[in-house]
Amino acid sequence: MDLKNGIADKEGLLSIEGSVEKIIYQNEENGYTVCEIFTPSDEIFTLVGNMPYLSEGETVSALGSWVNHATFGKQFKVEFYEKQLPATETAILKYLASGAVRGIGKVTAQRIVSQFGADSFEVIEHNPQWLSEIPGISPKKAEQISASFAAQFGMRNVMMFCREYFGPTTAVRIYKKWGNGALERIKQNPYILCGEIYGVGFEKADAIAKDLGMKKNAPERIAMGLKYVLMHNAASNGHSFLPLDKLCAVAKRLLSCEMNEIEDEAAALETRGEIVCVRHEGMKCAYLRDYYEAEKYTAEKLCALDRAGKNLGEDNVLSLISMVERESNMEYAVLQKRAICQAASNGVFILTGGPGTGKTTVVRAIIRVFDAMGLRIALAAPTGRAAKRMSQSAGEEAKTVHRLLEMEYGAEDKLRFRKNENDQLEDDVIIIDEASMLDLMLTDALLKAIKPGARLILIGDVNQLPPVGAGHVFDDIIKSDRFATVELTHIFRQAQESLIVTNAHAVNHGEYMNLESKSGDFFFLPRQEDAQTAATIAELCKKRLPKSYGLTVFDGIQVITPSRKGDAGTEMLNSALQSVINPPARGKAEKKVRDFTLREGDKVMQIKNNYDIEWNKNGTQGFGIFNGDIGVIKKIDLSEELITVDFEDKICEYDYTMLDELELAYAITVHKSQGSEYPIVIMPLYRYTPKLLTRNLLYTAITRAQSIVILVGNGEVAKAMVDNNRQTKRYTGLRYALEKYD
């Protein structure tokens, strides 16, 4: 940049330059910095923006605009910046003494500048061996100093290259992974960004490759295109593999290359071991290696646990059941007793059943029986909400599976679990609730952490929707007919009084619901027009339900809808509900994101797993906010470009580059509601696309309610959903892997 203070530059931005006098604040994760600079005109200004690795004593040139902060006054908001090396001995000394270069403190900085003066940087960069002439600097330390110095400007180069494609947070991640060689690696093959750097997909890497002049049929591009199709279908459609011909056909549409080029590269990927091809029912199928290994291990470990499960003796177990019955002053049904005995007789046991069939009662009894035997028991569920509900119903602490496995970060900030095959859980019995939500990769991690001889009990409702991630583990295990399974079917008298329970079972059996009742816990409000449906839902959330039940959308009411689109989809409903529940107001900050606005006080949802976001809960720090977690925006700092969200007392900060991970949550999709329960559930009924008018989607939605279900809209839609028992096919191979262990 050719900069002079205050002169307008490209895109209408202003330019400024000066030496950094003071770093007021710096976020190491995303590079957000607040600093004071001293300009050539002897003025001091405050700069704010993403300026990673900026240090006192450096000279900075920046493009941006002037803003007025409500508390701190006039500031220069930086859009683009460059660092320049200090030129004078005084500035060089200040920079080196600031701690910016690892291995150089104030004393060492003084010695270096005293010896080499204005040539200090030249020596550090190109002749580091000369530094060993200075007392206290060994040849090894001299090399470390030189490497640290180079890192400062390697980061600058990465930031400059990435600013056309990514936000600063992604640029920092790239530099942390590959260091000074990052740009060389990216320019050789930009597709290495896919799968290696969080938040970078194929389309973005493809744009970089195009700008770098890479050919459309380059092997690197075709290889990543094929792997991307597999990755996308695992993450978005739940497939652990794809038929090879389907994979190549989808990749052809994505890449616009010839089929023979794609088939050749698929064969090369198989030869290199990057994908694994096997035959299922005579069809050649392609896996990403991690998913193939996970299916193989899951089958092997499940069978090993089942074989090793010690039968604790039916007479002994029945005696303990009688003891528990006396303690609780109740008598278990025949099928419930069978379930308890099966849990004590097998290494792997599956308990399934719909609402009101007594699953919770059985789980409490199983816990009590194993506890009486002196066995160590761990309770867990896939989501935080499900774990919290399990704790309440079982009367024992339950953790998320991630917490049970002690999630942490290893080299290169990669997620890993401290509990694994090398450091297994000490518990003798592992009980997992909402097991229908377990995807393949989480199941693989869980099984690796279970010690030989321990028992695994999986509890869930097989009629719920499949997990969001790849695989259909719970369903595949049950359908394999390989493990002891009890399905509870009897609806107990108290549950029979609930229309939620009876209507849920009616739906599950293909029968129409009772929508005529005007009292109880299940209501239907007929509306013919989608706009009327949305207006009624807004009125229910804003006035009628808070007045009648004392609950709000923040503490008990959840709108659940099958679709994102349409007048009664999440996008339109969230906009309508936000306008009546949390409208704009003076002093209430807001930020436009994509096609909606986030506002202080809004109910929001995390829509993708973020394992590296930091949270603080009552002074305790941790990492990870997960897909489906719901919180409330507490603060939007427009000057620092940060949004603070409270996820049930876990306080997190999002910079603006992370806002694609949040969306409004006054209304959520049925898929996002999995594993959660709410006191009041409202569901719109309108003409969705046929693939969403399914029985198990309706069943999942109404079983999310603890106390009240309200359906609003067209009653014929409810009938159409009951009639449609279609389920989207998932390509999963666990059942095939289990067959090998019969």
Predicted regions and their residues:
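Conserved pre-motif I regulatory segment
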Residues: 319-347
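C-terminal accessory regions
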Residues: 627-742
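Loop/turn positions that initiate beta-strands
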Residues: 57-59, 601, 628
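Accessory, non-ATPase domains that flank or precede helicase/AAA+ motor cores in DNA-metabolism machines
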Residues: 1-319
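ASCE P-loop NTPase helicase motor core
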Residues: 337-340, 345-518
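Conserved helicase motor core of P-loop NTPases
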Residues: 462-623, 741
